[in-house]
Amino acid sequence: MMLHSGYQSGGDNPYNYNPKGATFGIGGVARLHLSDHFRTGFEGYFSTLGLKKDLVKGSHNKLFWTGILADWYWKAGRFYPYMGATVGGGMETAYYMFEGNSHDWLPETNTVFNKQPFFAVDPFIGCDIAVGEALRLTVKADWLMAIRKTGLNRPHGPRIYFGFIFAH
């Protein structure tokens, strides 16, 4: 399990609205060691950018992505630095409430909900730290590139992950 935080900016929407700010999320990874230095597996994450600063509270931009990963790692004592990439797919969900009240059950007229699938390429670099026989703490940084037919999807930006994994 890994928790993450990062910064997203930019927007692909017809409203000239540029969502930006801190994003937070959770996800996980499973890896299979194929050699002394090469691993493959899969990972998946949710990341949410709350937009209550610019829009009505409850507005958000969510990213979900998952895919197949491959990474190259080294062992240096109890440290396992690695670098690799994940290739897969995901969905961006944008909910923009430009005016109104998110705490009532009344219909809001100036609200937008949009979902956009994307092809995901996610290069990353990180380090696992062995703290026991089967437990490792991990720190990782990435930059998710969400690609659609029209080009690179936004918002995008870096994320830092902290978490733990079990190893054999």
Give names to the regions the model predicted.
Residues 29-105, 119-121, 129-135, 165-168:
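Gram-negative (and chloroplast) outer-membrane scaffold detector with strong preference
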Residues 1-34, 39-43, 159, 163-168:
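Short glycine/proline- and aromatic-enriched beta-strand/turn motifs that initiate or cap beta-hairpins
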Residues 1-6, 43-45, 84-88, 140-142:
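Transmembrane beta-strands of outer-membrane beta-barrel proteins
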Residues 140-167:
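C-terminal/domain-terminus segments
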Residues 126:
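Short, surface-exposed tryptophan/glycine-enriched loops
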Residues 9-13, 52-53, 105-111, 145:
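Extracytoplasmic loops and strand-loop junctions of Gram-negative outer membrane beta-barrel proteins
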